């Protein structure tokens, strides 16, 4: 290594200068690296969350932002009664929040996403730890609601982020469970996705379109391969196997946690399927013809 630096120094002497000039001409052919926003819940209290997200460990994780659940009454609170956002990683740097993940066939979402952790002490455990093949039926979760002031602060943060990255598509504002359905359940069924949609953040379905598909499907659901294809078209990392296997049930469960939180069993039903196709028609309309056989589209 010492000889390497000596060689570099010699080259600089031979060239006769130690710096160089640049001409900056901004190309029109570029865009932001940020295409996704991933929302998490911490499953820890604030102090534990902050330590987990900022200190080195055997399994290091981080996020760009952390939102507390309430104003902190201690010496570290410099904001009075105002709830602050904690910025932990600069948006132009990669935070380690998504883990093994996929959305719309894009993998390793850490590279192109902003991660937001919302403090919420929910808890999920597998009831059968000895079973290496995880099953939807073996997940036991205790979910908790989110305080109004916490969600109001999240709204302000999201509006601010979207002003900087206006090209982020509504369907690409996702839950951790959306992009890692076999591993994650956060932020959970109490997270107010519809409330965010009502102020222009994220995706949601239209009721008239939902009613149309609810009537189309009736009590006769299409084959499992069509269901897998529809989930995949919208963005969920579900392999098309033609079998109602566990990876499919995890995908359905993640979808239900986001869009039909009243029942997230992982079993596809008429209501969930109508919501899914209402979303596809709204946000993936160019893909709808692929399902003409089951929708009787002429």
What function would you assign to each model-found segment?
Residues 1-4:
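Positively charged n-region of N-terminal signal peptides that target proteins for export
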Residues 161-176, 239-243, 264-267:
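Surface-exposed patches in mature extracellular/periplasmic domains of secreted proteins
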């Amino acid at each position: 290594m010492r000889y390497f630096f000596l060689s570099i120094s010699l080259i600089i002497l031979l060239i006769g200068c130690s710096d160089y000039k640049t001409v900056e001409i901004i190309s029109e052919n570029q865009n932001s690296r940020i295409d996704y926003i991933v929302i998490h819940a911490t499953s820890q209290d604030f102090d534990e969350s902050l330590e987990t997200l900022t200190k080195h460990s055997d399994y290091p994780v981080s996020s760009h932002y952390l939102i507390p659940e309430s104003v902190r009454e201690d010496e570290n609170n410099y904001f009075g009664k105002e709830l602050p956002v904690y910025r932990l990683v600069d948006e132009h740097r990669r935070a380690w929040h998504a883990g093994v993940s996929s959305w719309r066939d894009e993998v390793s979402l850490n590279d192109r996403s902003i991660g937001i952790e919302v403090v919420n002490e929910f808890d999920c455990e597998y009831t059968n730890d000895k079973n290496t093949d995880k099953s939807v039926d073996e997940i036991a979760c205790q979910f908790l609601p989110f305080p109004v002031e916490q969600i109001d602060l999240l709204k302000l943060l999201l509006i601010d982020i979207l002003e900087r990255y206006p090209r982020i598509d509504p369907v690409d504002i996702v839950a951790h469970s959306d992009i890692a359905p076999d591993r994650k359940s956060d932020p959970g069924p109490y997270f107010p996705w519809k409330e965010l949609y009502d102020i222009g953040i994220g995706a949601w379905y239209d009721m008239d379109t939902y009613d149309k598909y609810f009537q189309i499907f009736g009590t006769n659901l299409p084959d499992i391969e069509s269901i897998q294809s529809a989930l995949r078209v919208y963005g969920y990392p579900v392999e098309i196997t033609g079998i109602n296997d566990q990876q499919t049930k995890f995908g359905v469960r993640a979808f239900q946690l986001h869009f039909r939180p009243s029942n997230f069993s992982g079993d596809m039903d008429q209501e969930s399927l109508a919501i899914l196709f209402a979303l596809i028609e709204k946000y993936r309309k160019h893909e709808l013809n692929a399902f003409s056989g089951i929708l009787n589209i002429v």
